[in-house]
Amino acid sequence: QNAVPTTSVAFQATISTGNPSKSSGQTVKPANQEMWDNGYGGNYNTSNYRFTAPVAGMYQFSNTHSVYSSPNGMWAGIKVNGSTLYVGTKINDNVGSGDHNMTCYVTTQLEKGDYVEAIDYTGNSQTYSSGASWNRFEGSLIAAYK
């Protein structure tokens, strides 16, 4: 049974000021600044960069991943419970200098207590672009279950 939640659940987090370095390979997005975190006392953790589902239901998430220059392959992903990985847009080769960004969207079913992370991949070390315009992890509850 679907139910209309009595409390909304939505968050957006970004990389705060500065442009941190990003090592090569898969990295959990260091989104350490909440833009908002509504519902059930907040469900996004700025220390471990995880969203934890407060109720069972269908959720939608997006990850926008941006770096400054010459990534040797790049993609944005969403990972559920440390194992199930959804990958969005992807480039396989070095595409030259300048800003590059990728986005991943996913709608998924979560149980109460499941966690979700934004995963950023580059084939070489990079520098993140900062701010919500360039790097953000966001999500919301679409439908709760009784």
Regions found by a protein language model. Name each.
Residues 95-96, 125-130:
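Short proline/glycine-enriched turn/loop segments at secondary-structure junctions
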Residues 99-115:
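Short, surface-exposed tryptophan/glycine-enriched loops
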Residues 86-95:
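Solvent-exposed serine/threonine-rich low-complexity stretches and specific carbohydrate-binding patches
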Residues 118-126:
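Short beta-strand-plus-loop segments that form exposed binding edges in beta-rich domains
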Residues 45-48, 101-105, 122-123:
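Short structured motifs
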Residues 1-71, 80, 84, 130-146:
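Terminal (often C-terminal
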